[in-house]
Regions:
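Mid-domain alpha/beta scaffold segments of enzyme catalytic cores
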Residues: 1-158
């Protein structure tokens, strides 16, 4: 297996073995020779289906999909304080995906917007066995140092 050099894109590139395509459970249809991360992005969380059969079906689908050998990571999971979804709901979705990542021993790709304190607390609370990767890090050196000190990995770019 070639090691992908781009851990986060939304479209299968011309050289699919060089990137990990991020998709939601509803859109995951693996193509030959492509690599994926599958997860529930905070922007995709609908408060209206929280705790319903729709949410249960989504989780069931995600749990099945992450066992596919073409899925190399879970995510993009995360916490985004700039969206209109209560933090408690975002944290519930995040925790479930973090636990799933540890269960299947695959890294968790994280979307983080103004959520450093929450992520540091959740990492301590969950104590994951899987790697946590902050996707598209654009913060200052002090923030990078803080994340690295707590065992996070950082990816750069969009």
């Amino acid at each position: 297996m070639k090691i992908p050099i781009d851990i986060h894109t939304h479209n299968v590139p011309s050289h699919p073995d060089e990137a990990i395509v991020n998709c939601s459970p509803e859109l995951f249809v693996p193509e030959k020779d492509a690599w994926y991360s599958v997860g529930i992005h905070p922007w995709s969380i609908a408060e209206s289906y929280y705790g319903t059969a729709v949410e249960h079906a989504l989780w069931k689908k995600l749990v099945e999909q992450v066992r596919n050998p073409q899925v190399l990571a879970i995510g993009e999971a995360g916490i985004d304080k700039l969206i209109n979804v209560p933090i408690v709901i975002q944290e519930d979705f995040f925790k479930e995906q973090a636990r799933l990542a540890s269960d299947v021993n695959k890294p968790l790709i994280i979307h983080a917007v103004k959520a450093t304190d929450e992520l540091l607390r959740l990492k301590k609370e969950i104590n994951p066995s899987a790697s946590w990767i902050i996707h598209g890090f654009r913060g200052k050196a002090a923030l990078a140092t803080e994340y690295l000190r707590h065992g996070f990995y950082l990816s750069f770019g969009e």
